[in-house]
């Protein structure tokens, strides 16, 4: 398995040298694997961060929310990849996204993805693949305003998620 291979190759010892030399400041890793692999990897080193996939549609995607909880319990900051599921959640069509429009028509589909993740205090970075100036501005607008994640927003997100799941196998 990959964790055993990392041990065999002495990768962590090599990284420790780079840290001592100042070539690496923060050591972390990205994972798409079951929680058991995450737990094994965390035994290798006192990592500065771990990157996982998480979005309102993929709460159980390995390691998913369970991975977030494990990392939070260990005080390891979390970096999020795929917050809009490769763009799919940014392009949820009407009428599937009607609950978003009803909650706040000024918010983009993507902004709901980010607002959902901002409720988790141990998420320190949310990666966002942007391909236009409009998307950059939307992201800046979303992250510029601190907003309480309300039950009404959570309900809107849950309803959109259920609308998507009714028509699409994820």
What are these regions (language model features)?
Residues 16, 48-60, 105:
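Acidic, His- and aromatic-enriched active-site or binding-groove loops in soluble protein domains
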């Amino acid at each position: 398995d990959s964790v055993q291979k990392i041990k065999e190759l002495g990768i962590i010892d090599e990284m420790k040298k780079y840290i001592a030399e100042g070539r690496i400041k923060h050591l972390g890793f990205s994972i798409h694997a079951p929680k058991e692999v995450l737990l094994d990897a965390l035994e290798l080193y006192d990592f500065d961060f771990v990157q996982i996939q998480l979005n309102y549609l993929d709460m159980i995607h390995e390691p998913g929310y369970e991975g977030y909880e494990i990392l939070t319990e260990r005080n390891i900051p979390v970096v999020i990849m795929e917050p809009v599921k490769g763009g799919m959640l940014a392009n949820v069509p009407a009428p599937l996204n009607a609950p978003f429009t009803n909650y706040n028509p000024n918010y983009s589909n993507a902004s709901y993805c980010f607002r959902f993740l901002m409720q988790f205090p141990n998420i320190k970075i949310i990666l966002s693949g942007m391909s236009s100036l409009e998307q950059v501005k939307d992201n800046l607008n979303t992250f510029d305003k601190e907003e309480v994640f309300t039950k009404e927003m959570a309900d809107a997100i849950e309803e959109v998620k259920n609308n998507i799941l009714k028509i699409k196998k994820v």
